[in-house]
């Protein structure tokens, strides 16, 4: 509980510290999946799990674009998390990952994004990871609507390729329907993210919905700071959780 409160407080205070420097000019707020930029982002997510359990994860993310057109990027993620399903509510290392992103076929009306991610079996305790090394592929089609909104449906496939023999294999598919409305104030952002999730290995399926609310706070660390809050809901008999909430602060373009 102490680490969870400290993490949430640090994330919120980091963003509030930049609010007084807010700017009126439009900035890249990180909602367009075809715009790759340098990102430093800590987030903390709490999930109310089914069965009366709970989990929390502090994710430390760093993204670096590269290539002549900055159409590639590499993201490193280290999670520090807890899950009390086995009675241990302490935080420890989860499964770290690295993700390569490539933007292609970009025009004024649409663009494509491919992401390849490797998730490594680095969790310090069994309940904090899958026990497997997992490869995840994501294909996104981003459509830029005449209203200025973005609709970017995606398909995500995850499969385990190695790991602990006693742990179940990973074979999941997610159909995601990401939408970004155009807001009058460019310093504000909203994303709506409904998804249909299939766990083929365990014969489970469930629905999820996450809505992100954000505010550009102004200059931070040589870039632009953004505070975000993301509540989420889950539905279906196989859902892993009932609801969740994530708070975050990210610096873009530093």
Residue spans of the language-model regions?
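Transmembrane beta-barrel domains of Gram-negative outer membranes and organellar outer membranes
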Residues: 22-254
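Cleavable N-terminal export/targeting peptides
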Residues: 1-31
């Amino acid at each position: 509980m102490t680490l969870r409160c400290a993490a949430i407080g640090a994330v919120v205070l980091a963003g509030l510290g930049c609010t007084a420097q807010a700017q009126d000019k439009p900035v890249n707020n990180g909602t367009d999946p075809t715009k790759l930029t340098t990102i430093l982002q800590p987030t903390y997510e709490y999930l109310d799990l089914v069965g009366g359990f709970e989990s929390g994860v502090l994710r430390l993310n760093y993204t670096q674009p590269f290539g002549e057109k900055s159409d590639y990027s590499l993201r490193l993620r280290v999670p520090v998390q807890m899950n009390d399903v086995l009675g241990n509510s302490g935080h420890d290392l989860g499964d770290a990952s690295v993700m390569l992103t490539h933007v292609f076929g970009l025009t004024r009306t649409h663009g494509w994004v491919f992401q390849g991610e490797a998730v490594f079996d680095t969790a310090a305790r069994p309940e904090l990871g899958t026990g497997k090394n997992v490869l995840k592929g994501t294909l996104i089609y981003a459509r830029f609507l005449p209203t200025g909104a973005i609709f970017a449906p995606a398909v995500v496939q995850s499969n385990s390729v190695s790991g602990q023999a006693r742990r179940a294999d990973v074979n999941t598919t997610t159909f995601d329907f990401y939408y970004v409305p155009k807001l009058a104030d460019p310093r504000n952002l909203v994303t709506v993210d409904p998804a249909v999730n299939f766990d083929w290995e365990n014969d489970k399926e469930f629905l999820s919905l996450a809505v992100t609310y954000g505010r550009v706070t102004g200059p931070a660390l040589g870039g632009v700071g953004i505070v975000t809050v993301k509540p989420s809901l889950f539905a279906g008999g196989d859902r892993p959780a009932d609801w969740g909430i994530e708070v975050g602060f990210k610096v873009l373009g530093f």
